[in-house]
Amino acid sequence: MMKGQLAGLMKQAQQMQENMKKMQEQLALIEVEGQSGAGLVKVTMTCRNEVRRVAIDPSLLADDKDMLEDLVAAAFNDAVRKAEATSQEKMSGMTSGLPLPPGFKLPF
């Protein structure tokens, strides 16, 4: 590899690293909401999987504890899926020119 090509590659890698850091900061600000039980349980989290809020409809508080736990877990899982999808969508622009294998997720 020629010296100029190596320098260009290093510069490109540094730019990508800076862009990844900026994207991670942006993802920390984006919130998604997962729901279950037709919206009776809601989990709001960032795209970095930090839970911000859990909202439970008061009508569920007198119900079966096991059912409520299942609904909370389902809402959490829904929020995680939405956060992952949003993150992949935002990152796809950064990785469009890279020869990455299918299904490869960034950040590593």
Swiss-Prot record:
Bias type Pro residues, positions: 99-108
Q: Which SUPFAM superfamilies match?
A: YbaB-like
Residue ranges annotated as compositionally biased, kind Polar residues, are 85-95
* Species annotation: Burkholderia mallei (strain ATCC 23344)
Recorded GO MF terms: DNA binding
HAMAP family given in the database record: DNA_YbaB_EbfC
So which domain of life are we looking at? Answer: Bacteria
Entry function: Binds to DNA and alters its conformation. May be involved in regulation of gene expression, nucleoid organization and DNA protection.
Could you describe the subunit structure of this protein?
Homodimer.
Protein known as = Nucleoid-associated protein BMA1360
Q: What is its main location?
A: cytoplasm
Mind telling me which GO cellular component terms the entry cites?
bacterial nucleoid; cytosol
Among Gene3D superfamilies, the record links this protein to: Nucleoid-associated protein YbaB-like domain
Q: Write out the ranges of the annotated region (Disordered).
A: 84-108
Keywords associated with the record? Cytoplasm, DNA-binding
Q: Which InterPro entries match?
A: YbaB-like_sf, YbaB/EbfC
Q: Does the keyword DNA-binding apply?
A: yes
List locations, semicolon-separated.
Cytoplasm, Nucleoid
Write down a Pfam family by its short name.
YbaB_DNA_bd
Similarity annotation: Belongs to the YbaB/EbfC family.
